[in-house]
């Protein structure tokens, strides 16, 4: 890449962007349309520019660019400041929208490398007909076409289609792009040999009824739910339309674990149609910190599903992930050969995990060989969610024996002293009332875990972001359980059951599955006694610290 050209082209884009806003015109696809006219103006007359625009295939593209011919002279002035060489370089080599996206979270080159990963997993070759459903602004199909692959793009957003056609014009690459809804019957019957579904990370920006009317989904109507993620239905449609029946779908983690999609996951796993799952790190895709997930659909995968954890295989700085070509090659090799961070998970093992396909369920850094599930030794309840208006009515200005515990009240593994007082606690909330030596654990990551110390007269009500764990003391010492959950191994065990793309959390159902290593009760009790001794020492240190701080405050 030419750094000098990039800097100048970036300055040019900011000027064009401000020009578009000042005119009250649409930024997308206006940025591409205005830039196209500006660059052409350096070499062609206004009349010639109109002729070139007429060569575009789509009426919508021609119309969108023609708007800016009215500003030919003004755009020519902008372009002349930077020169044809710089601007043509930018149009051929840079993604305009990404370059101007000041909120970007990742490396702009990640798009191309992610496309290369998908194409590499497809093993595209000469003679393939490749189609991308939800082609967006065309990065994927243009990348495929540049490798000599016949490429089709489909997107429901006409702005995306216009930008894709303009990009292909400047890169001198032949592609076909359609503005249609892949969910509808009779669309996209191209006879592709390889296809990708990348229809965005939104759950509900589509018509569920239209999707379910598709003829290819009729056998699956009973297991595809409206509350689920559409990628499963669309992947099936694409799979049925393919000549070879191989599809790669890009989605987000909820598709692998949410209860709404359990039925379709179970059906596809048992039919041998899910070949593999690859989880990539948060921040891989520009503009979102959501973790991308690759789902590979093909036939006759009766041995199980390849599941790969690639979340820590890329370089990450803060929220920015940088992908390098060698890393892409390594991921493809690991997946194809099912080695290192990729393993074949049997159908029976997936069934035992309730058809959750998240990688953290199947990769254990410190596997607990002899363990017992929390559900077998504990009573676990979620705290209560009380509306703010109702909670205000419950709060007491005067001290009472009733108090309320929130997430922020757990600091350094202890409950703070000054909890809000309540007038009383309705018995309908009894399951959320904490008892002495109960364990409290937060629902959200990072986990806050503490042991409750309370006399019999007081009652503390836990809120909805917390779980109450009451350990059967005949089976395990609650202090041992608490210490294990806080430990590195315990945190890794909890992490296996964490779900969520942005808000990482554990459900009560999954918390009950967390395993605790077995230990002789005598050893547990010894550990608990040592813990109590350490806590007494810490309390003395805290008191001394308070005295010292008080003395410091009196120095003046």
Protein language model annotation of sequence segments:
Residues 6, 28-31, 36-107:
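Long recognition/docking surfaces used for binding and targeting
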Residues 104-204, 252-253, 264, 270:
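Conserved S-adenosyl-L-methionine
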Residues 205-213, 391-426:
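DNA target-recognition patches
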Residues 225-290, 294-296:
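Conserved Class I SAM-dependent methyltransferase catalytic core
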Residues 287-370:
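Flexible, glycine-/basic-rich loop-and-beta segments that form/coincide
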Residues 295, 360, 459-467, 498-526, ...:
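A short glycine-rich beta-alpha junction/loop motif
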Residues 336-399, 411-414, 518-556:
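Non-catalytic DNA-recognition/assembly elements of restriction-modification systems
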Residues 429-432, 436-486:
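A short beta-sheet element
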């Amino acid at each position: 890449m030419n750094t000098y050209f990039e800097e100048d082209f970036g300055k040019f884009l900011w000027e064009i962007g401000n020009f578009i806003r000042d005119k009250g015109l649409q930024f997308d696809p206006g940025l591409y349309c205005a830039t196209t006219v500006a660059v052409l103006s350096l070499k062609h007359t206004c009349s010639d520019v109109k002729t070139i625009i007429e060569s575009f295939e789509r009426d919508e593209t021609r119309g969108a660019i023609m708007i800016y011919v009215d500003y030919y002279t003004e755009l020519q002035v902008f372009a002349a400041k930077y020169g044809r060489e710089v601007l043509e370089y930018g149009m051929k080599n840079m993604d305009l929208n990404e370059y101007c996206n000041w909120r970007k979270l990742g490396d702009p080159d990640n798009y191309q490398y992610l496309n290369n990963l998908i194409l590499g997993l497809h093993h595209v070759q000469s003679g393939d007909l490749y189609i991308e459903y939800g082609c967006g602004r065309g990065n994927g199909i243009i990348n495929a076409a540049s490798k000599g692959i016949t490429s089709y793009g489909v997107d429901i957003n006409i702005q995306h289609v216009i930008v894709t056609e303009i990009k292909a014009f400047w890169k001198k690459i032949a592609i076909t792009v359609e503005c249609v809804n892949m969910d509808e019957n009779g669309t996209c019957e191209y006879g592709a040999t390889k296809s990708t579904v990348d229809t965005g990370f939104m759950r509900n920006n589509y018509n569920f009824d239209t999707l379910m009317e598709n003829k290819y989904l009729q056998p699956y109507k009973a297991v595809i739910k409206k509350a689920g993620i559409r990628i499963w239905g669309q992947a099936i449609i694409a799979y049925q339309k393919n000549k070879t029946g191989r599809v790669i779908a890009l989605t987000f983690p909820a598709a692998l674990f949410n209860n709404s999609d359990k039925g379709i996951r179970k059906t596809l796993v048992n039919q041998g149609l899910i070949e593999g799952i690859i989880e990539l790190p948060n921040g891989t895709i520009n503009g979102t910190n959501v973790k991308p997930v690759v789902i590979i659909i093909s036939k006759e995968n009766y041995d199980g599903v390849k599941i790969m954890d690639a979340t820590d295989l890329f370089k990450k700085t803060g929220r920015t992930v940088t992908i390098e070509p060698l890393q892409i090659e390594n991921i493809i090799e690991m997946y194809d050969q099912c080695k290192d961070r990729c393993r074949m998970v049997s159908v029976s093992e997936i069934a035992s995990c309730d058809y959750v396909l998240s990688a953290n369920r199947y990769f254990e850094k410190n596997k607990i060989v002899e363990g017992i599930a929390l559900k077998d030794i504990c009573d676990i309840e979620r705290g209560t969610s009380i509306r703010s208006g109702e909670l205000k009515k419950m709060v007491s200005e005067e001290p009472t024996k009733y108090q309320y515990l929130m997430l922020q009240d757990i600091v350094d593994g202890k409950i703070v002293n000054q909890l809000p007082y309540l007038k009383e606690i309705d018995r309908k909330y009894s399951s959320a009332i904490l008892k002495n030596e109960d364990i409290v654990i937060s629902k959200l990551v990072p986990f806050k875990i503490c042991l409750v110390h309370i006399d019999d007269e007081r009652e503390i009500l836990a809120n909805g972001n917390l779980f109450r764990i009451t350990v059967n003391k005949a089976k395990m010492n609650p202090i041992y359980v608490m210490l294990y959950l806080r430990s590195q191994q315990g945190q890794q065990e909890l992490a296996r059951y964490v779900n969520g793309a942005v808000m990482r959390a554990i459900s009560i159902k999954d918390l009950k599955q967390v395993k605790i290593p077995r230990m002789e009760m005598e050893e547990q009790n010894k550990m608990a006694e040592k813990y109590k001794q350490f806590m007494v020492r810490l309390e003395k240190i805290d008191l001394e610290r308070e005295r010292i701080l008080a003395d410091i405050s009196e120095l003046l």
